[in-house]
Amino acid sequence: NTAREYFCFGRDRAFLDVMGHQGNDFQITGSFWKDLNRLTAELDKPGEFVCIPGYEWSANTAVGGDRNVHYRHEGETIHRSSHAQIADPTDMVDEEEDAHTAGLLFEKLKGKDCVVMAHVGGRYADITYAHDETLETAVEVHSDWGTFEWIVRDALEKGYRIGIVGNSDGHKGRPGASYPGASFFGSQGGLTCFLAPRLDRDAIFEAMRRRHHYATTGNRMLLDVSIATESDAALLLTNGGQAAAETSMVRKLIMGDMARVTDERVDLSVQVFGSVPIQMLDIFRGGVLIEKVRPFVAKDLGQRIRVTMEGAEYRGRARTTVWDGSLKVNGNSIRRAEMFNNWNLDRGIRSQ
């Protein structure tokens, strides 16, 4: 697929409102970088479709790992992790702009109008190696590669203030409707929902910097999370986690907000609207589970039993775990069985 076909699929077939192109930097030539910038400028239509220029900084995990770089404007410099697969000597003239470690990347991006997100692909991001709170505003929790709650735990343990995003990364040119099929990728691609007052770059970048967004594993559920305080709270304007200034005093905060609160307790409100019935809602404070809410009782289940096999054994490219197994019951019978969350059609129940 061409880059134009890629963008048009996301806009016209997957019905995305916001998207970007995140090619591996070591494969992006100078001419292709200019082509991508022309495309995003052409396709970006405030109020209709937000198309963001950017690239994937694709370094090995040992020097920081993959990062998604999103520029607010076209014409910015691409700071590659390397020129590894760029063969044309004329494309080596900007080699001094390369950033070979995540720390160097943040240095070169300092002062630029951009947002960085920690990406979990083949070379997963190590946010304990390097992190800049003024630039890196979010971590990726789900994509075609799977689900990575561990990177959220890493961030919380380090005291980072981060948002959570989900992406496609299916390598098949189907952003927003990315299914793995018979392939190495084991999951449906993720989506990010932005809480923004308008559909334009300014509003979306403000949402990214204030972490006003959430991720899903590909469904389009609606999630409204807020906190009400009894006393006035000092809401802080933020720039990638860095407190910049206080705004007017408020008594309601939404996801991603930072505020100085004097109350000993606050009221948490969570509204979830799913495309299917909700199984449960886990509420964490940092990395600690403090409440598990189920919208049903045992009698509602009838004779159904749910068996879940999940998880990964490794953080890197070979993270996919083969969950082959069997189930046998004594003194009873299995009337019917069906799979859930299984996207590879060549796998599943062989016999029953």
How would you name each of these model-derived features?
Residues 17-23, 50-54, 68-70, 115-118, ...:
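Structural recognition of the beta-strand scaffold that forms the well-ordered cores
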Residues 38-40, 124-130, 135-137, 149-352:
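C-terminal functional module detector
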Residues 101-151:
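Glycine/proline-rich, flexible active-site/cofactor-binding loop segments
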Residues 1-111:
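A metal-dependent hydrolase metal-coordination microenvironment
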Residues 24-26, 56-58, 121-122, 145, ...:
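Catalytic metal-binding/acid-base residues of hydrolase active sites
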Residues 54-55, 72, 119-121, 143-145, ...:
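Fold-independent oxyanion-binding glycine-rich loops
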